[in-house]
Amino acid sequence: MVWGKICWFSQRAGWTVFAESQISLSCSLCLHSGDQEAQNPNLVSQLCGVFLQNETNETIHMQMSMAVGQQALPLNIIAPKAVLVSLCGVLLNGTVFWLLCCGATNPYMVYILHLVAADVIYLCCSAVGFLQVTLLTYHGVVFFIPDFLAILSPFSFEVCLCLLVAISTERCVCVLFPIWYRCHRPKYTSNVVCTLIWGLPFCINIVKSLFLTYWKHVKACVIFLKLSGLFHAILSLVMCVSSLTLLIRFLCCSQQQKATRVYAVVQISAPMFLLWALPLSVAPLITDFKMFVTTSYLISLFLIINSSANPIIYFFVGSLRKKRLKESLRVILQRALADKPEVGRNKKAAGIDPMEQPHSTQHVENLLPREHRVDVET
């Protein structure tokens, strides 16, 4: 079975770069497997990720070398670049985290702060996984990754997905119900939502790890993986609906409502994530092992690029239409995540000078009569 090879490929070798696509592939496998899992003990051990403990390092080294040799070209091209992009992404996201750590003044900054932290975790796990592949491909060196990284990688990916859904949904509520959002929104909603987002995927991945590694219950394993795949599909659908609603609202009411920079950040980040993660929907349709390995590498590389590009989006939106060259990164970042329209810039873009408005102080003073003193000589 293809799944048995993939389970070994990602779990036993410690290649966390395939973790995000295992759930999607398992859903398609369950449609074909039926009740054969209970009749085939070998398939049971492969499906649940239960591996023999008495394998020697030489055997594992030989198996990994054979698996890598089947996809030498994608490894030579993708793995080193993925390591480099991951390290650059860690540096960029780390800078954003440091700038926002003490300056989260609105709900969107709180969400972005947690999103950056999840991106850093995911990029670190991906860098370690691809570094293992690179060393094995070019130098034949094998080192084993701790087991907790196999949980940490999909956990951080799911946190990123949930945070993007929360950001899109909150922005959608803010645009559709502005009065309720400004007056009745609970103050600590962002902190509570972020806490739940970190806790829910953590519990899901812990239970998934128990199903796959210790309990050896195939039926429960299959049901759980189906539910996990459904959970991912629902989150992606909610993000699509929120982004589309924001876009339609902006196109229909662009004259009445002034767009903020954080709106631009949301409208760029959410579709970019969906675009880079789009190949995930293709993975369940692949039955060839070699093709699945190549697709898994590409999916991982795309997700790494997306996580690394988020800070570039923040700084680009924050510095857009600003002619000041000497501005700190903190000011640019705070401007990008500000939830207030820039009145002066919008009026200037419309050809209106704010100082010439009828309600401005200068205009009122010009309308007042001036006093004239006349010195009368006696």
Swiss-Prot record:
User: Which membrane topology term applies here?
Assistant: Multi-pass membrane protein
- Per its UniProt entry, which superkingdom is the organism in? Eukaryota
Glycosylation annotated at which residues? N54, N57
GO biological process, any: G protein-coupled receptor signaling pathway
Q: Which GO terms describe its cellular component?
A: cytosol; membrane; nucleoplasm; plasma membrane
Q: Which InterPro entries match?
A: GPCR_Rhodpsn, GPCR_Rhodpsn_7TM, MRGPCRFAMILY
Disordered: region residues: 344-378
Extract the GO molecular function terms from the UniProt entry: G protein-coupled receptor activity
Q: What is this protein called?
A: Mas-related G-protein coupled receptor MRG
Gene source species? Homo sapiens (Human)
Q: Which gene encodes it?
A: MAS1L
